[in-house]
Amino acid sequence: MNKAIYESMNAAIKLLDKQAVIANNLANISTVGFKESFNLFIKDRNLQNLKKTYNQNVKEYYNFYPGTLIHTQRNLDLVIKNNGWLAIKDINGQEAYTKNGHIKINKEGKMTVQNYELIGNNGNIKIPNNVNLKISSNGIIKEIKKNKDSIIESTIGSLKLVRLQNDNLIQKENGLFYLKKDNLNKYKNILHDSSVRIQSEMLEASNVNPTKNMIDMISNARQFEMNMKIISMCDQNTEYANQLFNVNN
């Protein structure tokens, strides 16, 4: 393969990957607790093994910087502070983690985030019908009953809150974070961390910077177009060279 064509084609493929990541970021501007991601590429001029070179060049990173805090005055809205995470079950029953603290209660009395069931510190959490709830800063869920002269609090359960290093996490297509494969054995049974703190009646907004992502998208589109022109020019030059060769022979 012509070296210029290969390099331009490889660059174009990577730009398409970048565009997909940016498009996903922009689609989640309004998603509570969403962390934007970006691809970094290491330039490698080894042309002997094209497939191997391409796979090793791409690495995805995440921006874990906190999003803006939004006051909601809703008891079931939470901000999970610092490097704490809320543990939930995905559709396959696998434990996953999120910063999205917009909790709802489904018809079965289960607490959910984006329709994923929350994991309790001591088993499943079952919320009775028509109760006033309060979630303490340590994740304990309480039922609040008001009498004429007093307020009675009774514990229903506790959220599973974990503390994880950002480098150990990977985000999948469903938007949830999971432990990387090489950390599964090390952290096989992640326990509740009682030191993790939450803030109720607030939500953490997406940390996506729409202006930056739009600028990057436009820049990538221009670079992609430039690479397509280079490929086209190389094809034309090859065709002209072949025609001249045929004429001379």
UniProtKB/Swiss-Prot annotation:
Gene Ontology terms: cellular component: bacterial-type flagellum basal body
Domain of life per record: Bacteria
Keyword Iron among UniProt keywords: no
PROSITE patterns per the UniProt record, alphabetical: FLAGELLA_BB_ROD
UniProt cross-references to InterPro entries, sorted A to Z: Flag_bb_rod_N, Flagellar_basal_body_rod_CS, Flagellar_FlgE/F/G, Flg_bb/hook_C_dom, FlgE/F/G-like, LlgE_F_G-like_D1
Main location: other
Subcellular location: Bacterial flagellum basal body
GO BP terms, alphabetized: bacterial-type flagellum-dependent swarming motility
PANTHER family registered for this protein in UniProt: FLAGELLAR BASAL-BODY ROD PROTEIN FLGF, FLAGELLAR PROTEIN
Subunit and partners: The basal body constitutes a major portion of the flagellar organelle and consists of five rings (E,L,P,S, and M) mounted on a central rod. The rod consists of about 26 subunits of FlgG in the distal portion, and FlgB, FlgC and FlgF are thought to build up the proximal portion of the rod with about 6 subunits each.
Designated name of the protein: Flagellar basal-body rod protein FlgF
Lineage of source species: Bacteria, Pseudomonadati, Pseudomonadota, Gammaproteobacteria, Enterobacterales
